[in-house]
C-alpha cells in the first residue's frame, strides 16, 4: 500500500520523466545553490538583458517577431526552439564548473538523470557530484527487484511514449549493458519496433471474461464538453477542486473513464488540476487509450533496464554514491526575494550529520513521491494500515523545507488523508505453471515467449 497518492489540490508537473508526481508544487525539485542562484529573478528580461549582448542592444521593439528575438530567454531563464538544429549540438563547458559541486537527494530516475546531465552536458567532474540515498540500493520507485523472502516486488513503473524528449535525449548517451556499441535508447527502440506494445484484452468482467469495450469511448456530448471545459480552465481556478467537482456521471460512467483511470491510476476524488495536466500532457495519445498502443516498455523491469545502466555510467564517471544517508532538511537563507540553500541536515546510518554549503554548491531535491512510505504485505499478512507514514522520508523532508517559506508548497495536501491518497499494487511470483493457462486465456498470449503479454 502506498500512502503518497494524489488527493493534492495544488501542483504542477515539471518533468516528462515522472508526471506521476502531481504532488510537485512550484517548489518541486527544490533546486538550491549555496549562495548561487536558486530562483530566477522576476522581470529580469527587459532593458538590462538587452544591454548584455551586441545585436539585442539595438534591436527594434518588435524584434520578438523576428528570428533575432526568438532566442531571448524568458523569466525562467529558458527559451523555446524548434527543429533539431540544437538537439544534437554539445554545450560549451560552463565557466568555473570544475569549482562547483552538486548534492542530489535521492537516487530515483529524476535524481540519476540530474547527475547524468551534470556529467554529460554540465561537464562537472564526477567526483564533485554526491548522491545522497537513504536506502542501500539506487532506483527509487523503479525498484523491480527479486527479494528472496517476498519474490519480485515492484511498486511502480514508468509508462513511456514517443514524446519523452528528455528521457530519450538522456538514454542515447547511456551505454547498453548487453549490446556492445549500442545505447540504452538503441536497444529500447529496436525492442519496441520488433515487439510493439498493445493489448488484446483491455478490460475484464466476471473474473476474467473480456469486457469487449471494442475501442469505444462511449462519451456523450455533455461528457465531451465537461472534458473540454476542464482542459481550458486556468490552473488557479482548479486549486482545491477534485475531479468530482468538474465531472459527473456523463464522464464517470463512460468507457473513456475506464480507460483513463486504469492507465493513469486516477480516482474520482483526486486533483482536478492534475487531471487537467495529464490531459495536456497525453492528449496526443488519445487514440492509444483503448489498447495501450501509445505505450512503450523496456525488455526487463525498469530497475535493470534503466537504473542499472545509469548507475554504471555515473560510477564510471566517478560520481559519489552515499547509501544509508537520509536527508532530513535543507536549510535556506531567505532574503531580498532569494532563497539560498546553506546547509543539508542528514542521518547517516543513524548518526546525525550536516553538510555546510558554499556559493559553489548546487542542491537538487525531488519533493513528494508516489511510493514514499510504502507498507509491505505478503502471502500471509496484509499491509499494516495503521502505520504512520506521513512523517517518512521525503514527506518529512518536504515539511521541514516548507516550514521555512510558504513558497515551498503545502505537503499536507498530499499526505494528510491517507485513506484518499494511498494506492495499492501487487506483484505475483509464480512457483509453477498452474496460473499460466489463466493468463493466456485472458491476454490471448503465451507469457513464456519473452514478448508483450498483457500490453
Task: Tell where the protein language model's regions lie, with residue ranges.
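Extreme N-terminal leader/targeting segments of oxidoreductases
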Residues: 3-14, 21-102, 120-126
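Conserved FAD-binding subdomain of flavin-dependent enzymes
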Residues: 150-190
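Rossmann-like flavin
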Residues: 176-281, 296
Amino acid at each position: 500500500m502506498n500512502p503518497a497518492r494524489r488527493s493534492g489540490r495544488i501542483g504542477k508537473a515539471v518533468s516528462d520523466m515522472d508526471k506521476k508526481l502531481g504532488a510537485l508544487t512550484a517548489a518541486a525539485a527544490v533546486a538550491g545553490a549555496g549562495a548561487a542562484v536558486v530562483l530566477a529573478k522576476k522581470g529580469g528580461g527587459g532593458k538590462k538583458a538587452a544591454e548584455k549582448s551586441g545585436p539585442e542592444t539595438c534591436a527594434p521593439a518588435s524584434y520578438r517577431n523576428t528570428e533575432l528575438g526568438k532566442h531571448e530567454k524568458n523569466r525562467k531563464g529558458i527559451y523555446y526552439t524548434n527543429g533539431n538544429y540544437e538537439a544534437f549540438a554539445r554545450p560549451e563547458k560552463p565557466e568555473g564548473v570544475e569549482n562547483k559541486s552538486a548534492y542530489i537527494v535521492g537516487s530515483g530516475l529524476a535524481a540519476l538523470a540530474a547527475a547524468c546531465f551534470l556529467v554529460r552536458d554540465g561537464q562537472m567532474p564526477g567526483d564533485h557530484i554526491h548522491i545522497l540515498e537513504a536506502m542501500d540500493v539506487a532506483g527509487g520507485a523503479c525498484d523491480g527487484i527479486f527479494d528472496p523472502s517476498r519474490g519480485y516486488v515492484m511498486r511502480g513503473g514508468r509508462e513511456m511514449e514517443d514524446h519523452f524528449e528528455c528521457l530519450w535525449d538522456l538514454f542515447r548517451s547511456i551505454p547498453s549493458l548487453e549490446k556492445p556499441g549500442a545505447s540504452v535508447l538503441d536497444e529500447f527502440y529496436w525492442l519496441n519496433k520488433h515487439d510493439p506494445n498493445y493489448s488484446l484484452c483491455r478490460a475484464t468482467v466476471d473474473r476474467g471474461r473480456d469486457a469487449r469495450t471494442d475501442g469505444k469511448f462511449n462519451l456523450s456530448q455533455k461528457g465531451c464538453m465537461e472534458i473540454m471545459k476542464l482542459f481550458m480552465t486556468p490552473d488557479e481556478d482548479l486549486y482545491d477542486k477534485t475531479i468530482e467537482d468538474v465531472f459527473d456521471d456523463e464522464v464517470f460512467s463512460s468507457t473513456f473513464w475506464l480507460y483513463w483511470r486504469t492507465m493513469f491510476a486516477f480516482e474520482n476524488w483526486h486533483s482536478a488540476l492534475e487531471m487537467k495536466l495529464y490531459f495536456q500532457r497525453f492528449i496526443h495519445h488519445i487514440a492509444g487509450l483503448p489498447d495501450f498502443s501509445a505505450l512503450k516498455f523496456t525488455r526487463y523491469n525498469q530497475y535493470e533496464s534503466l537504473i542499472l545502466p545509469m548507475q554504471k555510467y555515473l560510477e564510471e564517471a566517478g560520481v559519489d554514491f552515499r547509501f544509508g544517508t537520509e536527508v532530513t532538511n535543507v536549510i535556506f537563507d531567505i532574503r531580498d526575494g532569494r532563497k539560498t540553500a546553506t546547509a543539508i541536515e542528514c542521518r547517516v546510518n543513524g548518526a546525525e550529520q550536516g553538510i555546510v554549503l558554499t556559493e559553489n554548491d548546487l542542491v537538487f531535491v525531488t519533493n513528494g513521491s508516489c511510493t514514499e512510505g510504502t507498507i509491505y504485505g505478503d502471502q500471509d499478512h496484509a499491509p499494516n494500515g495503521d502505520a504512520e507514514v506521513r512523517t517518512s522520508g521525503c514527506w518529512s523532508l518536504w515539511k521541514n523545507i516548507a516550514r521555512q517559506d510558504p513558497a515551498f508548497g503545502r505537503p499536507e495536501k498530499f499526505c494528510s488523508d491517507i485513506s484518499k491518497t494511498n494506492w495499492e499494487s501487487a506483484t505475483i511470483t509464480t512457483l509453477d505453471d498452474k496460473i499460466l493457462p489463466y493468463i493466456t486465456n485472458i491476454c490471448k498470449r503465451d507469457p513464456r515467449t519473452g514478448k508483450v503479454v498483457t500490453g
